[in-house]
């Protein structure tokens, strides 16, 4: 069973391990080499992120398999700073379920944004399937945005 919970400092070793596995595996889909965004493989960076972002543990049957970091820019604008899953659980719909769960947890958010490396066609297709539209290129990254309409009562 999939669960998404708020991270605590004690979770950061597992989050760094799964992040390293996920981002380093991107060499299989076009990355120029192993690596990821700043601090992607650092437990200490994760602990610092707890102070400025909403960090989540993604677990399947109690085992940490990934994570996510949200950055609130305003009451109605949320940035998906990072989301990752270990390669062993990718391709099974977990990523789509995680994004849907994150959106449901923030019903006031109308604008979701993220970026991904331009070379990562797999991510670009994934985000498009989840309702995100490419809205620009910033250096080597593609920016995405998803607008969510307010639900009308009744």
Describe the predicted segments one by one:
Residues 99, 106-118:
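Conserved GNAT acetyl-CoA-binding A-motif
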Residues 43-57:
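A short helix-loop-beta-strand connector motif used in the catalytic cores of GNAT acetyltransferases and
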Residues 17-45:
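Conserved GNAT-fold acetyl-CoA-binding loop/helix
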Residues 87-90, 113-124, 140-141:
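Conserved beta-strand-loop-alpha-helix junction that forms the acyl-donor binding cleft
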Residues 57, 63-72, 79, 84:
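Conserved beta-strand in the GNAT
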Residues 3-17:
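A short beta-loop-alpha structural element at the N-terminal edge
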Residues 72-83, 90, 108-109, 140:
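A conserved beta-turn-beta hairpin within the catalytic core of GNAT-like acetyltransferases
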Residues 85, 91-104, 125-129:
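Conserved acetyl-CoA-binding loop-helix of GNAT-fold acetyltransferases
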